[in-house]
Amino acid sequence: MFEKPVVKSFQYGNHTVTLETGVMARQATAAVMASMDDTSVFVSVVAKKEAVAGQDFFPLTVNYQERTYAAGKIPGGFFKREGRPSEGETLTARLIDRPIRPLFPSAFKNEVQVIATVVSINPDVNPDMITMIATSAALSIAGVPFNGPIGAARVGHINGELVLNPSNTELANSKLDLVVSGTEAAVLMVESEADNLSEEEMLSAVVFGHDQQQVVIKAINEFAAEVATPSWNWEAPVVNAELKAQVAELAETRLSEAYQITEKMARYEQVGAIKSEVVAALLVQNEALDEREIRGMLGALEKNVVRSRIIAGHPRIDGREKDMVRALDVRTGVLPRTHGSALFTRGETQALVTATLGTQRDAQIIDSLMGEKKDHFLLHYNFPPYCVGETGFVGSPKRREIGHGKLAKRGIAAVMPSVEEFPYTVRVVSEITESNGSSSMASVCGTSLALMDAGVPIKASVAGIAMGLVKEGDDFVVLSDILGDEDHLGDMDFKVAGTNAGITALQMDIKIEGITKEIMQIALNQAQGARKHILTVMDEAISGAREDISQYAPRIHTMKISSDKIKDVIGKGGAVIRALCEETGTTIEIEDDGTIKIAATEGAAAKEAIRRIEEITAEVEVGKIYPGKVMRIVDFGAFVTVLGPKEGLVHISQIAEERIEKVADHLQVGQEVQTKVLEIDRQGRIRLSIKEATAELNPVAATEVKDAE
């Protein structure tokens, strides 16, 4: 039934990688089952032979999905099936998309969909690397015009050594988590989080990862040669040279002048007007022309105009030199009721960032195939349409917002205090209120400021900067603090976050081949200078965490009880702790070792909660008098609570000096009384006396009662 499948196995670091095709999903354009030490991923590629008429973009979609059966689990929740992609799945989909997208021809507009499904998981082998490898293999045997294959490698920095594809266990002790992907000749994508590593160490890790993944690229080429899928007979559309010349004649000079307007919205308006006028003029000359084709040529001309000016050494779009950072404005404490806030403005990019402190109960529970964990540091990035002067749909976060938030979080993670040092869950929200490039790096700067304003003891200030590149032949210019247009029209987006001591995050996306180690070194060094300049300005506004947290933030008080007393504080079905929280207005968390954390915005509430817990956990002593409350009345006496929930019996004979016929004539449920502990038996039952407590506390009254008898 099946033709003989093609299988390719090779050693990659400490792992054995296997690629297989020919058995599953035979109606797809291409499909590969890939495995790396029991972590298996199935990747399919479907590409349409024809593009949609008039389509002016490349519709590439990457879907990454983790099936719970891969880990031998059934999904939680009511529906018991996987739902919308998690944040982790979205980030992995972006990780796959970024290095493959620039390898398709710019004129290729056919729809391509990649679906990657994790079908088996080894908890110590992250599926993202094998998924990238499988995607590269599937595209390489699909016959589509794909200028690959690519390789992928994760690099760790453990005990001063670079480690290829470290396990999840090893990563816990690594100062670096770096993913690098590229072709045989060039690096295309880098995503990393680091603990203040130097520029030289980061560059060495990138080069190391690229060198190591040559094994993968060689294996995929051999795999593709064995599969031998015929290539598509796709050719780029022939460019209308006459129309291109007409467009250049009408628009080149005007576009060059327009790109000397430094204000973004005014420049956009002028460029838009020029394009509309050129389109109208050409359509008047020849109605048969395609407006989309004209606009495509105008876009290419616009790109060429901007790039030519930069290569020629002219000032940039907004008048800056290549290594200049835009004007900075830094403010903290801008919102009165938030726990911490900052407004960070860099040119026409602005972020309003807030920090909120919560208890450990507020931590994000992440339930992935690799297991469950809690995240006590959350960073959410919002990019509303108004920040670029547009209208648009406002709803759940898009892939880009999730990705930018993760990058900003990576930049800050290395300086965050541990939960033991600062027992709070911290949520940061970055609202981008203006955007003209590098909003994720503005979020890094704003987050550092807002955390300090909130009193979070971060280890150092962190700043981020986005670098760009324009390369024509052997000539190139590295740009600091790029604008949105420079990002769009340039060849590289290179984002670096870090402290004065080193780099904490690095993200790089390269659109062309030929980015050398020399260029990356220049970009890193130039970024270091820009980062330190920004840090100097930030430190003038606030250089360390405030001495105290906001008066509106919960204050966490810690106390310790014996672990065998935990059940007393919790109570039956959680009744005691629930009542404590409700009646004192606090949040109480109890750990297995008896550590209790009490969070309250008011000191008096915390003190009351502590007093009551101490009361509950205190040992009842024979002979001592305690205040109590009547809980139940029975024929032979009354049950009274002492020291919180502890309950003892006051026998009818121990209520008063005189003889009592009915307990209810002397005591009522809810009545507060003073009781003396007479005895605690072997079973822990407490015998109490109101009569003796009264005699000790009010001896005169007790004597009068005896005399009356």
UniProtKB/Swiss-Prot annotation:
UniProt xrefs under InterPro entries: ExoRNase_PH_dom1 (IPR001247), ExoRNase_PH_dom2 (IPR015847), ExoRNase_PH_dom2_sf (IPR036345), KH_dom (IPR004087), KH_dom_type_1 (IPR004088), KH_dom_type_1_sf (IPR036612), NA-bd_OB-fold (IPR012340), PNPase (IPR012162)
Highest taxon of the lineage: Bacteria
Gene Ontology CC annotation, any one: cytosol
PROSITE patterns, A to Z: KH_TYPE_1 (PS50084), S1 (PS50126)
Keyword annotations: Cytoplasm, Magnesium, Metal-binding, Nucleotidyltransferase, RNA-binding, Transferase
Cell location: Cytoplasm
Catalysed reactions, as listed in the record: RNA(n+1) + phosphate = RNA(n) + a ribonucleoside 5'-diphosphate
Signal sequence interval, chain numbering: none
Enzyme class: transferase
EC code(s) of this entry: 2.7.7.8
Pfam families: KH_1 (PF00013), PNPase (PF03726), RNase_PH (PF01138), RNase_PH_C (PF03725), S1 (PF00575)
Keyword NAD: no
S1 motif domain span: 623-691
Binding-site list for Mg(2+): D487, D493
Any Gene Ontology biological process: RNA processing
Subunit structure: Component of the RNA degradosome, which is a multiprotein complex involved in RNA processing and mRNA degradation.
Name recorded for this polypeptide: Polyribonucleotide nucleotidyltransferase
Organism this protein belongs to: Aliivibrio salmonicida (strain LFI1238) (Vibrio salmonicida (strain LFI1238))
Gene designation: pnp
